[in-house]
Amino acid sequence: MNKAYYIGLMSGTSMDGVDAVLVDFAGEQPQLIATHTEAIPSHLLKGLQRLCLPGNDEINRLGRLDRSVGKLFALAVNNLLAKAQIAKEDIIAIGSHGQTVRHMPNLEVGFTLQIGDPNTIATETGIDVIADFRRKDIALGGQGAPLVPAFHQQTFAQVGKKRVILNIGGIANITYLTGNREEVLGFDTGPGNTLIDAWIQQVKNEPYDKDGEWAASGKTDQQLLAQLLSHPYFSLAYPKSTGRELFNQAWLEQQLSQFNQLDEEDIQSTLLDLTCHSIARDILKLAPVGELFVCGGGAFNSELMQRLAALLPDYHIDTTSALGVDPKWAEGIAFAWLAMRHHLGLPANLPAVTGASREAVLGGRFSAK
């Protein structure tokens, strides 16, 4: 059988590394061939975190970081290919998400901005790059996010089966597969790992709360939880998308200002419940019973999964590995899939999900030649 090799590159709002995946799309289902995670050097991580907040000298910093992130993404590709022992000539294209530094689709003139110069990636890998997937959807009046529901529909939809696919990265998003292959809903529910990561990084200088152990040692404060859940985003109708612009450390500190008496682990437990309650509320609005398959980093947080199960007693809950897709790499595979759709001239957005006026071929091609 002929191979159809594509590479997907993903670095999410958690900024916990660049995921690189090599995928073969020759068969009916995507086949994961090789994976690699490239750590983000601390100086680059600090620069990105700083750029995500309003500041001075932003254009100079943006330009430098755009190139630096491009070089890091290229390094991820070259290390992936070395690991897989596959030549660059065998790859049709790279699908690069880039690193989001602003996502503000609801302004009068909405925009989204991902950096990681695709020209640099193409030049340093010798492979054509397809990138800038979100801005066409925004140009068509959409949110530019989430984009993964189209991939979820293609890969996980089954006639007659109601399924929810939950992707928990920095931000959490859900795809509702109604059992009718043509009908799909999807949107960002709110914070995924972003606030629980930010709090443990601030207090304990640890990158993340492994298995939710720190959250499990605390007790949720119901008053704080109610205040956090009163954020206007949670009552917005979909299509909707969000990011660090709404849910960030500055917002968290503002919310905590009236709760100085709380223990740090109680705050962590409350933040985990914010993630779980906001997800569960939105799922229950779609359907009271069904199947839920989880992917993204949150799928590996056992405390999160237990709390979600308690809030959704009539759901059968598993990870996407039960459907043949490794939950750790699902989003990287989705961006390889988006590259394939562009290469074949096929649309990749779902107007019912993003609010765009029509379907469209997403992204632009940056030649290695």
Curated annotation (Swiss-Prot):
Organism in which the protein naturally occurs: Shewanella sp. (strain ANA-3)
Reactions catalysed according to its record: 1,6-anhydro-N-acetyl-beta-muramate + ATP + H2O = N-acetyl-D-muramate 6-phosphate + ADP + H(+)
Transferase keyword on record: yes
Annotated family: Belongs to the anhydro-N-acetylmuramic acid kinase family.
EC top class, as a word: transferase
Molecular functions per Gene Ontology: ATP binding; kinase activity; phosphotransferase activity, alcohol group as acceptor
Keywords: ATP-binding, Carbohydrate metabolism, Kinase, Nucleotide-binding, Transferase
Residues holding ATP: G12, T13, S14, M15, D16, G17, V18, D19
Enzyme Commission number: 2.7.1.170
Name under which the protein is recorded: Anhydro-N-acetylmuramic acid kinase
InterPro entries from the UniProt entry: Anhydro_N_Ac-Mur_kinase, ATPase_NBD
Source species, domain of life: Bacteria
NCBIfam families reported in the protein's UniProt record: PRK09585.1-3, PRK09585.3-2
A single BP term in Gene Ontology: amino sugar metabolic process
Gene3D superfamilies, per the entry: 3.30.420.40
